[in-house]
Amino acid sequence: MSITRPTGSYARQMLDPGGWVEADEDTFYDRAQEYSQVLQRVTDVLDTCRQQKGHVFEGGLWSGGAANAANGALGANINQLMTLQDYLATVITWHRHIAGLIEQAKSDIGNNVDGAQREIDILENDPSLDADERHTAINSLVTATHGANVSLVAETAERVLESKNWKPPKNALEDLLQQKSPPPPDVPTLVVPSPGTPGTPGTPITPGTPITPGTPITPIPGAPVTPITPTPGTPVTPVTPGKPVTPVTPVKPGTPGEPTPITPVTPPVAPATPATPATPVTPAPAPHPQPAPAPAPSPGPQPVTPATPGPSGPATPGTPGGEPAPHVKPAALAEQPGVPGQHAGGGTQSGPAHADESAASVTPAAASGVPGARAAAAAPSGTAVGAGARSSVGTAAASGAGSHAATGRAPVATSDKAAAPSTRAASARTAPPARPPSTDHIDKPDRSESADDGTPVSMIPVSAARAARDAATAAASARQRGRGDALRLARRIAAALNASDNNAGDYGFFWITAVTTDGSIVVANSYGLAYIPDGMELPNKVYLASADHAIPVDEIARCATYPVLAVQAWAAFHDMTLRAVIGTAEQLASSDPGVAKIVLEPDDIPESGKMTGRSRLEVVDPSAAAQLADTTDQRLLDLLPPAPVDVNPPGDERHMLWFELMKPMTSTATGREAAHLRAFRAYAAHSQEIALHQAHTATDAAVQRVAVADWLYWQYVTGLLDRALAAAC
């Protein structure tokens, strides 16, 4: 049964508009079940074809030229059926994944509304508040909760978009084929159903006639071996023990097939000597969720018989491969607290590795398609929800009713779709040219750490509205720590880059921010190469796409003036997969990044975009910045060429040169990037000349150091543009 919409006196205000997921998760679960039935039918046909093929052609019943042709045709049909199996596994696991996302979002939203309603009840009964104060506090709480719910819906939509290139988890097909019957709906369990009728709890199992096995699948090729019982001969009549023994959970067969026969063994009778187990299992006082031990001992390569209380001790359910028991919860619900069997099969499953994420975008640990029915989402405690809501209210109240955030500016008629050059495939890339003389401290992407690992959130300015939304969704996002934090950090960086003090009104100038599936953050703007406005700093572990020394300069130049293409090329060169691209609605309107778009709202953008981090010289040329930092004030001129012969300052033409480089941005014609780079090169060379004169004539050490830093920066940019223009010729 799908999760219903929360109700209450303030529920509608906290949900509308856009604060509730209207999709029905049951539709996706039911469709996945229908495809599972199709998969079983296809598998039956495939098994029959394989058996007949082996019997007729490999058993020697038919041979010769015609037999070889028929054998080849049947083999081709078998391959097609196997491909169909793979497609069905993809469809089934995707539907279950989407259903899990919808279910989790609804559960989190319901928790938010319930927690807010409890807080409202407290406020309504608080005698210390007058009517106006009570009304203001309740409205603030309702507004913050609505914002949190809208953010949850948006994040769920982003994750759904990320799954459009979905690939099923490893072994998903095998798990689906092993699943013969789904567990009871809405009751997550780790106990594998017993092959026989269990006895009354507290008494030994009464032996009965063994069930004739089907065709058990043994771990090694060959015909199935008749199960060997621990005691040879006729089963011994059980002896009632002095004290009733609680039956233990039977061990799952090594490779599940049809149910294996039960061979009862009473506690007083010693079983036959089994093979030595890989890891002895310590009996637990009572069944409870715990990591699965090594497989229980089994006599030879036959199917494992159910374990009974004996010398080997009770065992918890597990599989020989150490993988989770098949009865796990749907996607996005695997780590909810309060559900029995949370750590089945050994610990909390980690998310997919980088290679998996690049293929599947989001692959939740429980999305293997194993469960046939949903598990009820475990709600976080009301205390946590209430705390999150109070935090949101406090933030919102401190910031006032309205937001003073700047609206941000985007270019006019400078869409990335216009005359967008395509990046070349990896095999067609030219070898990178010789690097600049000093590249000892090149800032390369570090896959071991994401941007949120090394960048404190306090270093990034944030608007009051965005801070309130982040605070309200903090509890719900705790399960996705890492990926969620990187996306949240990237959103704040994008908002800061679009703040009014980072935007001087230059025509067509704007920033795009992107985050990869492994948490790396990269930014790009529409002007020049390696261009960062004076005074702007970028946080650590945030990469500038056009200043990457590893990428051939001709590829960087092709993406000039197209920041969405720039971040795509950067990710492709480093074999990363973009998770989302962030910008304002105007900046993203005519672009198709191929991944989720996160649109910045006007109240997301802070009044000031001042960030603490690296200067522009540190970003584009870390070794030169380090050399400057190590140079004393008395030796600063050693970093510069000799002073110009003409002691008069050069005429400052930067204003006119800047106007010239803006002209190509008014066009959407093919080749505008080349014209823009030529004009930008002239501006960079002139800025370098002025910085050199200022450095030689400065009398104050601090002013001189700033001028030297400017000269080093423009020297690097000029050299980069020279190489880019030469490569374009």
UniProtKB/Swiss-Prot annotation:
It comes from the Bacteria. Coiled coil: none annotated. Disruption phenotype: Inactivation does not abolish EsxA (ESAT-6) secretion, EsxA-specific immunogenicity and enhanced virulence. Residues 200-215, 236-255, 315-325, 399-410, 418-432 have a biased composition (Low complexity). The keyword Ribonucleoprotein does not apply. One of its GO terms (cellular component) is cytosol. Residues 216-235, 256-271, 280-314 have a biased composition (Pro residues). Residues 175-366, 399-457 are annotated as: Disordered. InterPro entries: ESAT-6-like_sf. It is found in: Cytoplasm. Residues 438-450 have a biased composition (Basic and acidic residues). The keyword 4Fe-4S does not apply. Keywords: Cytoplasm. Transmembrane segments: none annotated. May act as a chaperone that facilitates EspB secretion through an interaction with EccCb1. Interacts with EspB and EccCb1. This is ESX-1 secretion-associated protein EspK. It comes from Mycobacterium tuberculosis (strain ATCC 25618 / H37Rv).
